[in-house]
């Protein structure tokens, strides 16, 4: 039996380098905040994935197949709760600290009371007026999408098609539907679950990432921990890189022609003299129907 100094709770509390996590025992794993239609569909799929018992976690390729996670322990202490709230504000709001009047105190109280999970808290912060004022109304469409990915999934968009799909979703169903789709996605569920605050995950070799993910996240200011995303401008930081990658993917593959030696064909020629036309073989005269001669 583990002692107090070596218990799971003590070990987790001592690990400060890992992601911030907090477990709500009463309703862990359930979304208890209002969802849009897109969010309801994503939530339905998420519950089916959860029922399958698939391993959770970011799936570090360097650990496969030696480390497979089927469950994850999250602390439920007051210190863990405080750490989660601070980390969520920093991550979701792009390192832009709100004032006391701008904080979502109602969400904080519900999280403290165990009424919502960390996932719901993150979802609520991304739908707040403070977030919309800084990362929706004040920026361009592609800039807003790339910040949504950075804040909620811990990565930059992988390609231009991913950006276009989410811009279309936002235009057709609204901003809240976009947020629900991201926080209720299978990717969010697998990597962060219901208890972990999103974090930058492009520094390691995670499953599904490509080699330019690190550079795209660097363009988004992922390495600038002392600068807020709001201070880095309103224009997209990844539009040129994604456009170049899109052009490269659609460029036709080079090929070479192989020369073929052509052999000239000489047809035999009929030669005759005088007025005698050469006789034709196998000639059948045409006879109209009913005429005989």
From Swiss-Prot:
GO biological process: photosynthesis
Keywords: Antenna complex, Bile pigment, Chromophore, Electron transport, Membrane, Photosynthesis, Phycobilisome, Thylakoid, Transport
UniProt xrefs under Pfam families: PBS_linker_poly (PF00427)
Positions that bind phycourobilin: 49
The keyword Electron transport is annotated on this UniProt entry: yes
Post-translational modification: Contains one covalently linked phycourobilin chromophore.
Annotated localization: Cellular thylakoid membrane
UniProt membrane topology term: Peripheral membrane protein
Primary localisation category: membrane
GO CC terms, sorted: phycobilisome; plasma membrane-derived thylakoid membrane
Disulfide bond sites: none
Domain PBS-linker: 50-229
Role: This protein is a bile pigment-bearing rod linker polypeptide that associates with C-phycoerythrin.
Designated name of the protein: Phycoerythrin class 2 subunit gamma, linker polypeptide
Species name: Synechococcus sp. (strain WH8020)
